[in-house]
Amino acid sequence: MEERGFMSPSLAISASYREGGSKGMSRRRSMRPSFDADNEFMNLLHGSDPVRIELNRLENEVRDKDRELSEGQAEIKALRLSERQREKAVEELTEELGKMAEKLKLIENLLESKNLEIKKINEEKKASMAAQFAAEASLRRVHAAQKDDDMPPIEAILAPLEAELKLSRQEIAKLQDDNKSLDRLTKSKEAALLDAERTVQSALAKASMVDDLQNKNQELMKQIEICQEENRIIDKMHRQKVAEVEKLMQSVRELEEAVLAGGAAANAVRDYQRKFQEMNEERKILERELARAKVNANRVATVVANEWKDSNDKVMPVRQWLEERRFLQGEMQQLRDKLAIADRAAKSEAQLKEKFLLRLRVLEESLKGPTSSSSRGTSVGRSSSNGPTRRQSLGGAETSPKITSNGSLIKRTPSSQLRSLTASASTVLKHAKGTSRSFDGGTRSLDRSKVLINGPRSNFPLNHKSSEGTSRGESPSSIKGEEESADKATNNDSVPGVLYDLLQKEVITLRKAAHEKDQSLRDKDEAIEMLAKKVETLTKAMDVEAKKMRREVAVMGKEVAAMRVVDKGQQDSKTRRLSVSKGNTAQLLSGRVSGRIGMTRSTQ
């Protein structure tokens, strides 16, 4: 009953643990659809693959922990079954021990009764020996008296004495038979006692084993409680991490909405640029049609002028056609040369663009929070003080536009911008120590850099147009109009400072969010490493305890073997003692019998 009472708290703990495990499994099952929805939403997002990978890894770790818990529960069930079997075996052994104890008590009572009988027989032997000695003394006296006096015949005196001797001999034979039977009983009882001692020793060994197993079960229950607490802590950590991931997802959604809003503004700017280019192309077509109309008008004017002139004053239309043909061929050659130059310039500009895009990528990867915050502060200060002017901070390089008398913005030349960009890139690459790559911040900032780089290069086609107009010999008024339209186009092409500041703020917030995500991921990695270390320590402790169990079992086996050897030696010594005592008793009895026979012969 005590053992059952001792095992009841463990069963209660196991029941509570099963309830807790079932609750945890139901919670995990309820959490799995939310995880699936999050994974589907994460697949729809761009640049959130690391978060999804982290969630998958955390789910895999939770599944591994669940498997370990199920294995531990299976081991606990197996241990409980083994404990129940051991309890049954202990109960059976206790019953057998009670039976053997009762048998031992009965055997002890029989031995006491037999010992009392042996004592009585020995006393009777002593009395018979005393009577024998008295009879012998009386015979001697009778013989002595016969010698002296005439006495009755000796036969009359010896007959009753011989009858008594025969009776005493018969009693002695009976007593010897009784002694032999008692010796046999004592041997059988000693063998039964040895068997009982062996069973008692085996029962004691089993009881000690049961005690050891109970202690080990208590230690295992303590370890299970520790593991349960650790699993609870891990569940709390997992919930916190899930909440953090949800917060990060919300921040990513907000950032993507902000980026989409900025992208809409950038798309509007691109639409305006496209419209401006289409208008420039239409203007070129109109200029060509004007030139053709002028040539046709000149031809018609020459024909009309030649109608009223004399034959001598008329101009040969063939010569005029040849001159016009030469003029047009020269213009076509010039246009071809300009096209070749423009192709070369476009190729060189494309190469430079690729180089500067690579440099911008390196710069954006090398830039950190302090540089972005300082550039944001300077740009906000400049925009608040100068109004329409703006400041472009690309890794520390500033490109401030100049203000004309009319209030229009004139940008720097592309060469000066490229030099400033290369200088800023070299300085940032020298001073940058660590890079933190965000999810989509690099590509979005590259798109913004493309817009900024393509902005000042829109001046080139206008300059080419002005050169074409001068080469064709157009009027200076048309050239001035083209320059004014070009200035207006450049002014319309420029991005306002407020939009740029908003985009820059969004980029800074994106970088901060990316940095916070990196830190949270590092913290999660550290926590996972700590949990892995704890699991390793637990496995090592379990291995050490298993080794200790094996060693203790081996030691117990050795002790049992030693006990068996000792029991065999004791049995051999007891058998030797019994054989020696039996030999001594036989010798004594034979000596006594021979003495008595000699006495009877001497008396006869």
UniProtKB/Swiss-Prot annotation:
Gene Ontology molecular function, alphabetical: microtubule binding
Signal peptide positions on this chain: none
Subcellular locations according to the entry: Cytoplasm, Cytoskeleton
Coiled-coil region: 49-351, 521-569
Transmembrane segments: none
GO cellular component: cytoplasm; microtubule
Polar residues bias spans: 401-422, 468-478
GO biological process: one example: cytoskeleton organization
Entry superkingdom: Eukaryota
Classification via Pfam families: MAP70 (PF07058)
Positions of the UniProt region annotated as Required for targeting to microtubules: 233-470
Family annotation (InterPro entries): MAP70 (IPR009768)
Main location: cytoplasm
Region (Disordered): 1-33, 367-422, 434-495
Biased composition (Low complexity): 371-385
Keywords from the named record: Coiled coil, Cytoplasm, Cytoskeleton, Microtubule
Family: Belongs to the MAP70 family.
PANTHER family for this protein: MICROTUBULE-ASSOCIATED PROTEIN 70-2, MICROTUBULE-ASSOCIATED PROTEIN 70-4
Functional note: Plant-specific protein that interact with microtubules.
Protein name: Microtubule-associated protein 70-4
Organism in which the protein naturally occurs: Arabidopsis thaliana
Origin organism lineage: Eukaryota, Viridiplantae, Streptophyta, Embryophyta, Tracheophyta
